[in-house]
Amino acid sequence: MLFRSNKTNPSYEGIDLKAKPSDTKDSKYNTEYASNEITDSIVGVLCYSDEITDDSQCTSQGSGIIITSDGYVVTNSHVIGNSKTLYLIQIVTSDGKQYKAGVVGYDTRTDLALLKMDDASGLKAANFGNSKDVALGENVIAIGNPGGIKYSNSITQGIVSAVDRQSSITTNVKFIQTDAAINPGNSGGALVNMFGQVIGVSSSKIAATDYEGMGFAIPSATVKDVIDDIMKYGYVQGRVMIGVVGENVQSRGNIPAGIAIYSIDEDGPCGNTELKQNDIITGADGKKISNFAEFYDVLESHKAGDKLELEYYRTSDSSTGKVTITLQESK
């Protein structure tokens, strides 16, 4: 059995986005204060393909943020393989204690996931600030496990370099940009202001030497919207899907950019249509689509039951076509 079942919590009141304290100019609010406030709320997330033993090698690892005293943890969806069942999951807290955990739900569109630790109590939940109050140039720290659990609770310092930054062609999330170092293993960790409040969940880093010093975090306001729904329902309400698995592809020769289809859910909106594996989605609603970020922007304006016209390119014979589907709720 490769997963543990975890229930939602319909009575959850939601992540509380706190305002900055009134005495913001007090000198006590510095990196040391912020570090002390957040350290015990950061965990390591270790994912295993097989049973967890002392000799097991983890397949994926990242960081997470405790949001309730009984062990609900926010992390990135890609850390857990964008799946409820792919991995056995172990959580390691700041004091070295180990817990088994399961996936409550995940959202690939924002790269967020919610985990539940087994038999956990008395944990320190992180305080969250409101990312809408973030100021350019504001001092921040990033905390997580860069390079894995052996470097747990590593802290780097920086500033808020930009807000509402589109940094990825796989999501339409508008990120907080920082120059605080965010390295592999930091995924799912916290970006924290000097008041010890989480203002973002670390998600990605442009891994190129020309762009050193550009880290990105999912804003806490987005985290609240997504995680509150997952906690209550196990998924994000109101999201629609087309029922395909695919990947962004760039144009090459006569082949256009778009979303290459790897598989189609026969029970989904694209099942029993003319679309085939290896077709490339190039348009939706009359708009050109070259990546998932653009496609998600189109889907945001639709609800389950809406009709959506897709344009596609067939790689097998270089033909093009259109198909109309009925959108379903993504659960």
Question: Where is each model-derived feature located?
Answer:
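Conserved active-site neighborhood of the chymotrypsin/trypsin-like protease fold
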Residues: 19-21, 68-150, 290-292, 309-311, ...
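N-terminal activation segment of mature serine protease catalytic domains
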Residues: 3-63, 228
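PDZ/PDZ-like groove recognition
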Residues: 51, 181, 229-298, 306, ...
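A conserved glycine-rich beta-strand in the N-terminal activation segment of trypsin-fold
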Residues: 25-33, 49-72, 97-100, 125-127, ...
